[in-house]
C-alpha cells in the first residue's frame, strides 16, 4: 500500500535488515547523497534506511535535503554510470526473480507470526483508514481484516 518507504534507526542497519525481510521490498542503506543517487539508479529499490545517529548533527538538515534530492530528483533505474544501465537493469531483474522465489506470500507470513505482534502493528490510530483504500491486493486485505478481528 506504499510506493516508497523511508525509515531508519541509530545506524540504519537494523531498519534496513528488517525491511529487507519482507517480500517485495528492496531497502538500501543511505548515509549520504551519493548513496541515495546510486541506490536509486543502480539498485532501483523501494525503501531506504537512514542512520539517524550518524551524520545528522550540525548541517544534518542539508544532508537530508541532498539525500532526498538525489533519491527522488532524477528518476530511478537509469544506471550509474549511465553506460552501465543495461547490465544493471538485467541484474535488477535477476535479483527480483530470486526474491520472488525466496519469499513467501505476505498473507501467509502474517498468519504465521505471533498474533499479538501483528495486531499491535495494525493497531495504529489511522492504520485502517490509510491501508484499506490503498491496498491493491484483495487477499492481503482479507488477511489483515481477519487478523484485526
What are these regions (language model features)?
Residues 2-8, 27:
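A short, small-residue-rich loop immediately preceding and capping a beta-strand
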Residues 9, 31-32, 51-52:
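Short secondary-structure boundary segments
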Amino acid at each position: 500500500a506504499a510506493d516508497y518507504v523511508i525509515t531508519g534507526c541509530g545506524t540504519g542497519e537494523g531498519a534496513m535488515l528488517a525491511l529487507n525481510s519482507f517480500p517485495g521490498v528492496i531497502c538500501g542503506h543511505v548515509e549520504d547523497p551519493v548513496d541515495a543517487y546510486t541506490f536509486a539508479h543502480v539498485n532501483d529499490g523501494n525503501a531506504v534506511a537512514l542512520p539517524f545517529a550518524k551524520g545528522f548533527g550540525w548541517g544534518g538538515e542539508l544532508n537530508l535535503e541532498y539525500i532526498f534530492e538525489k533519491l527522488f530528483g532524477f528518476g530511478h533505474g537509469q544506471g550509474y554510470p549511465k553506460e552501465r544501465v543495461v547490465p544493471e537493469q538485467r541484474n535488477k531483474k535477476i535479483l527480483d526473480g530470486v526474491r520472488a522465489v525466496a519469499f513467501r506470500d505476505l498473507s501467509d507470513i502474517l498468519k504465521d507470526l505471533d498474533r499479538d505482534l501483528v495486531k499491535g502493528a495494525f493497531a495504529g490510530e489511522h492504520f485502517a483508514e490509510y491501508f484499506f483504500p490503498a491496498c491493491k491486493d484483495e487477499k492481503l486485505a482479507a488477511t489483515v481484516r481477519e487478523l484485526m478481528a
